A protein has these predicted regions:
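Bacterial Sec-dependent N-terminal signal peptides
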Residues: 1-27
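Peripheral terminal and inter-domain segments
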Residues: 26, 335-437
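Terminal peptide-recognition signature
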Residues: 40, 88, 147, 178, ...
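Extended, small/polar residue-biased N-terminal targeting/export presequences
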Residues: 51-140
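STAS-typified acidic loop motif
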Residues: 134-160, 296
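Short acidic catalytic loops
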Residues: 147-148, 173-185
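A short, well-ordered alpha-helical element
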Residues: 155-174
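Gly/Ser/Thr-rich loop/hinge elements
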Residues: 185-238, 272-278, 289-295, 300, ...
Length: 437
């Protein structure tokens, strides 16, 4: 089945080549409001995925134009575009529908306007210069793979070696976190390519139904596309309110296939692939021309967003996902040493996160000698001297501190409420107890 090609706001508006949208190109001619409204209505009527909504929008825009609601913007195309979009949203809010002004497109024929050869070359160079939007790959403590990814670009063939290198680096991770908190969308072909690395068998994850030409595209996670690289470890996806469109496509497909746990905020709620349509006089309308249908739910995330399995503020999602991974591994651990190792890693996530720095007078409760450990204070800082090796303690929570890069120390009260013992937990899961002298 023929694939659907979509060009998103990311390419055409947010990152348009400078020569396409410079201020010098703005026309000083008066905008013909009624002609513009008629052209917008025609494009919506012919292409919008929901014809009934297109008719409602058209009625409202004609009414607004007839009342003269746009007359004051006839010399300010950017404000006019914003007002028309606001009026569209007052009738039906589709986050993918965007009205913009870009005089660099004036020479294009009305209707669907794919990029020119010059624009396509510019976009291709842009994404290549930005490493196809792969900025970093990282191995976090506890052998957790971490890959932040902000845009699904269309250049799958060119990007494939980069994807394979990034995921190959994480192939021995015990779990993987894909961070889509800043992902605003992109191309379904790239979504499908990335999904393919996480399935052992060909799996249908999304169907896109096109109103314009009645075409339907089926998007599979297909291990045949990955040259033998398959990652089977537990997977966590981080989301935020900014996660949108293609980012939601990836998240929703993985969630419904039960391949990933979603951690973070409800996503933006845009499920409709779009194309840009020139409506004359330098104006463009990004029109959703198709809809997604998940093979499991038979619906999509339009308007509702993707609901996380674990809801948490986006700023806390990375730590939460790591904690979930460690808790799961701790519950499955067969030895006390492995359980303690996971506890060490969990504690390390919360250094200076829970209570911050304790008041100085609180430090004094811990001062003293515990076996070879001499705990003392200098000003508002707490230190440990072990045979001349001095470390500043970093607070985790209440009576728990980081001793150094390989150990944590917890002060334990006796039945009289006095801190009389120090427990040392090492990064390898070792546990040692020292009584206070």
């Amino acid at each position: 089945m023929k694939q659907l090609k979509t060009y998103h706001v990311f390419f055409l508006l947010a990152f348009a080549a400078p020569n396409l949208c410079s201020a010098q190109n703005i026309s000083k001619d008066l905008i013909n409001i009624h002609t513009l409204v008629d052209s917008i209505n025609l494009s919506l009527g012919n292409n919008y995925i929901f014809p009934d909504k297109a008719r409602m929008i058209a009625t409202h825009l004609r009414s607004q134009a007839k009342k003269g609601a746009y007359n004051s913007f006839s010399t300010d195309p950017h404000k006019l575009a914003s007002q028309v979009q606001a009026d569209i949203y007052s009738i039906h809010r589709d986050p993918h529908m965007v009205v913009g002004y870009n005089p660099g497109w004036q020479g294009h024929q009305k209707g669907y306007t794919g990029p020119t050869e010059e624009e396509a070359r510019w976009f291709a160079k842009f994404v290549k210069d930005n490493n196809f939007m792969f900025k970093k790959v990282e191995l976090l403590p506890g052998n957790i793979g971490y890959l932040p990814f902000n845009i699904f670009v269309e250049h799958v063939k060119d990007a494939k070696p980069i994807i394979a290198s990034a995921l190959g680096f994480l192939a021995n991770s015990s779990a993987i976190i894909i961070d889509l908190r800043e992902n605003t969308g992109g191309e379904p072909e790239m979504v499908s390519q990335l999904e393919s690395y996480f399935f052992k068998e060909k799996t249908l994850l999304n169907v896109i139904i096109n109103r314009s030409n009645k075409d339907t595209a089926f998007y599979y996670a297909d291990p045949a596309k990955t040259d033998g690289l398959t990652l089977s470890m537990p997977m966590y996806i981080l989301t935020s309110k900014k996660t949108f469109s293609g980012g939601e496509d990836f998240t929703y497909g993985m969630q419904q296939a039960k391949r990933a746990t979603i951690v973070g905020e409800v996503t933006g709620g845009g499920a409709h692939p779009t194309n840009p349509f020139s409506v004359g006089q330098g104006f463009l309308v990004q029109i959703p021309f198709a809809r997604s249908s998940n093979p499991v739910t038979k619906t999509d995330w339009e308007g509702t967003g993707v609901i996380p399995d674990i809801k948490v503020e986006s700023s806390k999602a990375l730590i939460k996902a790591q904690e979930l991974i460690f808790r799961e591994r701790q519950a499955m651990a067969k030895t006390e040493e492995e359980k303690q190792k996971m506890e060490y890693l969990i504690n390390g996530l919360h250094v200076n996160k829970d209570l911050g720095t304790l008041p100085v007078d609180e430090f004094d409760k811990f001062l003293g000698t515990y076996g070879p450990l001499n705990i003392y204070r200098e000003g508002n800082k707490l230190f440990c001297n072990i045979s001349g090796n001095i470390s500043e303690l970093a607070h985790i929570s209440k009576n728990l501190f980081v001793l150094d890069g390989n150990a944590q120390i917890e002060f334990i009260k006796d039945d009289k409420g006095v801190y009389s013992m120090a427990k040392l937990l090492t990064s390898h899961g070792g546990l040692f107890e020292e009584l206070r002298k």
